[in-house]
């Protein structure tokens, strides 16, 4: 399973990398089962090109919940179109490990 992310922001960063690398197993393990959709977890043809963390509330090593607001940049590999998505993600601890619950477009 690997080492648990110490903060919600660390989990956010690792999940972005998992989306970019299409690591479905990692995304599955770090998604709260109550809110986890069926795979695949990405849009085919999307290449993730950057992540900028805008802020985090709580989500520290001693917290049980936290939020991370970020902007992720993407490119459509077929058309070359580029764009960004902004999200405020909610995280919580489950069995002592941070998991992603849900996100809202910010």
Give the label of every model feature segment.
Residues 31, 48-50, 98:
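Tryptophan-centered motif/residue detector
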Residues 1, 23-25, 63, 76, ...:
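Acidic-enriched, low-complexity/disordered segments with a strong bias for Aspartate over Glutamate
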Residues 16-19, 26-28, 70, 91, ...:
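Aromatic side chains
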Residues 43-84:
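Surface-exposed, charged secondary-structure patches
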Residues 1-44:
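Core segments of small alpha/beta cavity-forming domains
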Residues 83-106:
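Short beta-strand edge/turn micro-motifs at domain boundaries
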Residues 32-36, 56-62, 95:
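Rieske [2Fe-2S] iron-sulfur-binding subdomain
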């Amino acid at each position: 399973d690997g080492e648990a992310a110490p903060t919600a922001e660390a989990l956010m960063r690792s999940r972005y990398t998992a989306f970019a690398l299409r690591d479905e197993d990692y995304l599955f393990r770090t998604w709260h089962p109550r809110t986890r959709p069926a795979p695949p977890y990405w849009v085919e043809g999307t290449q993730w090109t950057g992540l900028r963390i805008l802020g985090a509330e709580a989500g520290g090593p001693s917290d049980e919940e936290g939020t991370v607001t970020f902007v992720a940049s993407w490119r459509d590999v077929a058309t070359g179109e580029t764009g960004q998505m902004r999200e405020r993600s909610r995280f919580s601890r489950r069995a002592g490990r941070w998991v992603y619950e849900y996100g809202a477009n910010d």
